[in-house]
Amino acid sequence: MMRAAYFASKLNFKIESTCRASMITQVERIKIVSWERIRDEYIKILKTDKPSIGLVILQKTGLMKYVFPEIDVMYDMEQSPEWHHKDVFAHTLQVVDNAAKLTDKMEIRFAALVHDIAKPNTRRIHPKKGYTFHGHDAVGEKMLDKVGKRMRLSKNLTKYLKKLTLLHLRPIALVKSEVTDSAVRRLMVSAGNELKDLMVLCRADITTKNPRLVKRYLKNFDIVEQKMQVVLDK
């Protein structure tokens, strides 16, 4: 069943209705498949040019509930419209597809998939701000230990995903002119060898359809990278 989702994503085709119906009725049979196999099929989907095709199939057929429940609960989870124009699941799909356009590196694409994994657990309603997700970066980092063990991810991959999830909100905070060199340096030290990958993830996280806003956000990340270079040159 996951292989069908992979081929649909790889070859950009729709699954025939009878086959899709069978996937839905037989969905619980995924329980007999090893987590190593599930992991491998998931990674194959992430390596395609447009992973969202396969990920949507997993969700629509009910497979996602079994193979990645933390992603499944993002579906239809509303975000405040003044901040996000999509629900959490749709936003995540777009980030993954954006990452696929920016890099062939599977690890970054995987990070794009899980970077907001804790939003369902941290969603609160503020009387003026609407929905908030305070701390979803730190909570998400902790959740990935359980995900890594269940999906039989390598320790290195789990560590990598945890780091990018924890840090994905940090770069944009460095745009302000009053930010000190020491603040920039702290992020660089925290990110370490994954700094470039973190910046790719941040750029992929721009999902607005407004070209003016896209240009502004990309420019902000250019400013952050310029500040990093200044610190390196000192």
Predicted regions span which residues?
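Short flexible/disordered coil segments
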Residues: 78-90, 130-134, 174-179, 217-234
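Hydrophobic alpha-helical segments
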Residues: 120, 150, 168-171, 194, ...
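Generic detector of well-ordered alpha-helical segments enriched in charged/polar residues
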Residues: 20-24, 39, 43, 55-56, ...
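Histidine/acidic-rich helix-loop-helix segments that form or flank divalent-metal centers
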Residues: 82-84, 153-218
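Glycine- and charge-enriched loop/helix tracts that form the active or gating conduit
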Residues: 1-113, 117-135, 139-156, 171
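Short C-terminal domain-edge/linker segments immediately following a structured domain
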Residues: 88-89, 141-145, 194-197, 230-233
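Charged substrate- and nucleic-acid-binding regions of tRNA-handling and nucleotidyl-transfer enzymes
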Residues: 2-6, 145-152, 207-234
